[in-house]
C-alpha cells in the first residue's frame, strides 16, 4: 500500500508542473475562450439552420483548453526571468526551474500541433480566423514591456 501511495505522489509531482504551465489549475482562462466560441456556434447554428453537433462542441472545448495553455506557455517562456523576481509569479514552473525552457518549447509545439489538428476540422473561414488569432497571442507578452496597460491587449487577444 505504501508503494502505491509513493508512486501516486511521484506521478502527481511529475504532472503538476505541466498542469500549472498550461494553467489548468486556473480554468477561468479557457472558460473566457470557450464560452464565446460555444455561444457563437449556437447562434450561428440557429441563424443558418445548422444542427448543433456534439463533435464541434468538443472541438471548441478542447481547442480552448489547448490554446489557453499554449498562450500561457508562450507568456511564461518570454517572462521567465521577470517571473522569477516577482513574488506572485516566482513559483511558476519555468521561473522556478521545475521545467526547462527547452521542454516548455516542446510542450508549446505539442499544444499548438494538437490545436491545429482541431482547427483543420472546421471550414476555411474558421481556419483563417483561427490562424490569425496567433498574432495577438504572440504579441501580448511583449506588450508588458512597452505599455502600462498590457491587459487591454490581453482583452483584445481574448476577444479575437
Predicted regions and their residues:
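Cytosolic, membrane-interface loops and tails of multi-pass inner-membrane proteins
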Residues: 2-16, 72-99
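Juxtamembrane/transmembrane-helix boundary motifs in multi-pass membrane proteins
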Residues: 8, 12, 24, 47-55, ...
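Membrane interfacial helix-start motif at the N-side
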Residues: 16-29, 98
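Intramembrane alpha-helical segments
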Residues: 19-20, 92-160
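The first (N-terminal) embedded transmembrane alpha-helix
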Residues: 24-43
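Alpha-helical transmembrane segments of integral membrane proteins
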Residues: 28-32, 51, 55-59, 63, ...
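Membrane-embedded alpha-helical segments that form the functional core of polytopic membrane enzymes
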Residues: 37-38, 42-78, 88, 112-116, ...
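Perimembrane helix-loop junctions in membrane proteins
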Residues: 44, 48, 80-83, 144-148
Amino acid at each position: 500500500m505504501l508503494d502505491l501511495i509513493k508512486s501516486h505522489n511521484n506521478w502527481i509531482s511529475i504532472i503538476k508542473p505541466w498542469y500549472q504551465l498550461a494553467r489548468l489549475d486556473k480554468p477561468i482562462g479557457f472558460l473566457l475562450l470557450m464560452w464565446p466560441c460555444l455561444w457563437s456556434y449556437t447562434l450561428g447554428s440557429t441563424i443558418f439552420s445548422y444542427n448543433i453537433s456534439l463533435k464541434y462542441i468538443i472541438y471548441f472545448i478542447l481547442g480552448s483548453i489547448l490554446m489557453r495553455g499554449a498562450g500561457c506557455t508562450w507568456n511564461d517562456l518570454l517572462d521567465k526571468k521577470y517571473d522569477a523576481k516577482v513574488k506572485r509569479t516566482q513559483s511558476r514552473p519555468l521561473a522556478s526551474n521545475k521545467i526547462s525552457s527547452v521542454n516548455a518549447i516542446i510542450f508549446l509545439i505539442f499544444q499548438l500541433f494538437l490545436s491545429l489538428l482541431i482547427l483543420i476540422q472546421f471550414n476555411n473561414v474558421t481556419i483563417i480566423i483561427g490562424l490569425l488569432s496567433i498574432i495577438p497571442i504572440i504579441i501580448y507578452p511583449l506588450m508588458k514591456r512597452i505599455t502600462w496597460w498590457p491587459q487591454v491587449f490581453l482583452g483584445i487577444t481574448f476577444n479575437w
